[in-house]
């Protein structure tokens, strides 16, 4: 195994060693028998159709794209978004979270734009390329007795060294972050993958980060970088104790000792938050329950509507969890937080709150199930003096992928930018909330008025993705909303994909720029903007 030395860290070259001999073929045959006997192959794969379907190949940089309008100088850099794009067809089930990570990038410089798409070359991806087919267990398989059998197939392949799991088996398909001169591709079931961004916008997977072997657990897809200190705060969750482990990484890339967080059961913890002095963990009742998977023929994570939602507030440099304060609120689940800050005796969390989540809906084979999804913007307050917790609804449904001006991460800010959705997956518009304004409690749908300061509607048959805020001038000295929102859009009427840029202050229906892309860009997950300074900084390594 090779490595490339970095200050306070080593990027591991991912060189798995799978085996494709007689034993591998025998296990493949056994799997085919199990699939034939226990899997209903007539079920359609909604997440592999329409614009959820993967693109077959990578696209090297395509230059001088058509730009309607103008691309402001502050957008010099590369806008990147990652999402699931399976290289090979599934053996049986498929969940939206299962696909191989593919990064779509728009390189912008001096008003011109180039497009590129590249797979993240994970250990999983490399091994399935070696076999020329799908070999790793999928979330979409983990249902009922069939799920248990597929878990055992994965364990058998690992035990017989057909698959090499020494580098993990994640997809790097969920989110992106920049820290310590590196762009990282993330999925919460694995360690980070480092991505190099070239001057022409091209992308290359350098390898995996394990922070000099100090990282021995999974790494969330939603770490937080403090813009004032340069530190990155992160955690990982597991189905074995300790169920949650908290980490602090210095601005120089050194990972501090692990801090186990004590909770009673293994849960899905997709996100967390930081303030200037605290980190906030969410012990929400979406439990890892393999027995219920088999008994009830559900996915391996199931939601318990009888349990409270718990929020743990920990001093962010704590060496253990002795001083964590737990607060309870009514039952819910949260995929994504917008931001958090301290306000006198209270910790304030701005988040998207979901009642009665059902991951079967996210991975559902039946398209109509997608309409049963309600996600709303909430303000939650945790009083560190009295121990009381309260919450306030800030929006109608459905809002997700909340973003802020990241110069204010962990500090009080005014504006939240989110996506409006007609289902769990299709983004119909970009919305701007003013937290200084009161919500219009009489409204049952999202429209301008009250605390909704703007709404950019994509129009019939057009759907978008997470919008990233890019300030005109970095920092907190300029107006908080003096900048732009940039995001991918797909037009299902024409089959064409675009990048839109809109004015974050005005939220006008007229975009600042629209860039036509040379190929279809499937719907995906989270996005990030690599500034020109960051692009040049990481190019030195």
From Swiss-Prot:
Comment on bound cofactor: Binds 1 Fe(2+) ion per subunit.
Chain ranges passing through the membrane: none
InterPro entries: Carotenoid_Oase
Claim: Metal-binding is one of the keywords in the record: yes
GO terms under cellular component: chloroplast stroma
GO biological process: carotene catabolic process
GO molecular function: carotenoid dioxygenase activity; metal ion binding
First-tier enzyme category under EC: oxidoreductase
Enzyme Commission no: 1.14.99.n4
Coiled-coil residues: none
Keyword Flavoprotein (UniProt): no
Required cofactor names: Fe(2+)
Highest taxon of the lineage: Eukaryota
Record key words, sorted: Dioxygenase, Iron, Metal-binding, Oxidoreductase
Binding positions for Fe cation per the UniProt entry: 222, 270, 336, 526
A Pfam family it matches: RPE65
The reaction(s) this protein catalyses: all-trans-zeaxanthin + 2 O2 = 4,9-dimethyldodeca-2,4,6,8,10-pentaenedial + 2 (3R)-hydroxy-beta-ionone
Family classification: Belongs to the carotenoid oxygenase family.
Summary of the function given for this chain in its UniProt record: Cleaves a variety of carotenoids at the 9-10 and 9'-10' double bonds. Probably not involved in abscisic acid biosynthesis.
Full protein name: Carotenoid 9,10(9',10')-cleavage dioxygenase 1
Record organism: Pisum sativum (Garden pea)
């Amino acid at each position: 195994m090779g490595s490339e030395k970095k200050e306070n860290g080593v990027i591991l070259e991912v060189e798995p060693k799978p085996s494709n001999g007689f034993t591998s073929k025998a296990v493949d045959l056994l799997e085919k028998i199990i699939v034939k006997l226990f899997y209903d192959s007539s079920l359609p794969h909604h997440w592999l159709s329409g614009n959820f379907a993967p693109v077959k190949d990578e696209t090297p940089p395509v230059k001088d794209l058509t730009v309607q309008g103008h691309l402001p100088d502050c957008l010099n850099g590369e806008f990147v978004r990652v999402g699931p794009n399976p290289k090979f067809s599934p053996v049986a089930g498929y969940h939206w979270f299962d696909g191989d990570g593919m990064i779509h990038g728009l390189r912008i410089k001096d008003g011109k734009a180039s497009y590129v798409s590249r797979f993240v070359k994970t250990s999983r991806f490399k091994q399935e390329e070696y076999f020329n087919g799908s070999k790793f267990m999928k979330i979409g398989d983990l249902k009922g007795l069939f799920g248990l059998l597929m878990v055992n197939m994965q364990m058998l392949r690992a035990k017989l060294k057909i698959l090499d799991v020494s580098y993990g088996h994640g997809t790097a398909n969920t989110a992106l972050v920049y820290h310590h001169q590196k762009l990282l591709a993330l999925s919460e079931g694995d360690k980070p993958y480092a991505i190099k961004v070239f001057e022409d916008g091209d992308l290359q997977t350098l390898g995996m980060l394990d922070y000099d072997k100090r990282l021995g657990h999974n790494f969330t897809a939603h770490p937080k970088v403090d813009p004032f200190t340069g530190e990155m705060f992160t955690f990982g969750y597991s189905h074995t104790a300790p169920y949650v482990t908290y980490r602090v990484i210095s601005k120089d890339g050194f990972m501090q000792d692990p801090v186990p967080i004590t909770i009673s059961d293994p849960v899905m913890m997709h996100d967390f938050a930081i303030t200037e002095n605290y980190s906030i963990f969410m012990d929400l009742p979406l439990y890892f329950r393999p027995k219920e998977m088999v008994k009830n023929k559900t996915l391996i994570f199931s939601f318990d509507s009888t349990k409270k939602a718990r929020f743990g507030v920990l001093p962010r440099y704590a060496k253990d969890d002795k001083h964590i304060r737990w607060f309870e609120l009514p039952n819910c689940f949260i995929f994504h937080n917008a931001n958090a800050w301290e306000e006198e005796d209270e910790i304030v969390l701005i988040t998207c709150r979901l009642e009665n989540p059902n991951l079967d809906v996210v991975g559902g084979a039946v398209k109509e199930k997608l309409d049963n999804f309600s996600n709303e913007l909430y303000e939650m307050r945790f009083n560190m003096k009295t121990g009381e917790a309260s919450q306030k609804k800030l929006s109608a449904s459905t809002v997700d992928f909340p973003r802020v001006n990241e110069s204010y991460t962990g500090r009080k800010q005014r504006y939240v930018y989110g996506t409006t959705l007609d289902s769990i997956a299709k983004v119909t518009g970009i919305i701007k909330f003013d937290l200084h304004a009161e919500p219009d409690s009489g409204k049952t749908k999202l429209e301008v008025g009250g605390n909704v300061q703007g709404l950019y509607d994509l129009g019939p048959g057009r759907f978008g993705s997470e919008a990233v805020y890019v300030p005109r001038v970095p920092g907190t000295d300029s107006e908080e909303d003096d900048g732009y929102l940039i995001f991918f859009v797909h037009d299902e009427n024409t089959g064409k994909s675009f990048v839109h840029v809109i004015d974050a202050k005005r939220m006008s229906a007229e975009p600042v720029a629209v860039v036509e892309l040379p190929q279809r860009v499937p719907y995906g997950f989270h996005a990030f903007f690599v500034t020109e300074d960051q692009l040049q900084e990481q190019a030195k390594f």
